[in-house]
Amino acid sequence: MEKTYVVTDETGIHARPATVLVSEASKFESNINIEYNGKKANLKSIMGVMALGIMQGAEFKVTTDGADADDAAKAISNVIASQGIGKEK
């Protein structure tokens, strides 16, 4: 499953939102990736997510693949919205 989001957090996906996303993604067995500007990272890796340098207004994609992919996609969407990280495009 793939969803596209736009970052609304004024400081982008920095340490705090990255930590929240990684924590949520780590609850699932599925492969969960985040893609920005042609680069892809494992959403379960704080260093990978931070290295992408996703700023406010940027579009990024989250892909989930595996046994619990649908549940993972819903959970990640909920975190992105509830934490003010971004909104689904």
Where are these regions (language model features)?
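Compact, glycine-rich, soluble single-domain proteins
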Residues: 6-56, 64
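C-terminal structural segments of small proteins and small subunits
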Residues: 53-89
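Absolute protein N-terminus
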Residues: 1-3
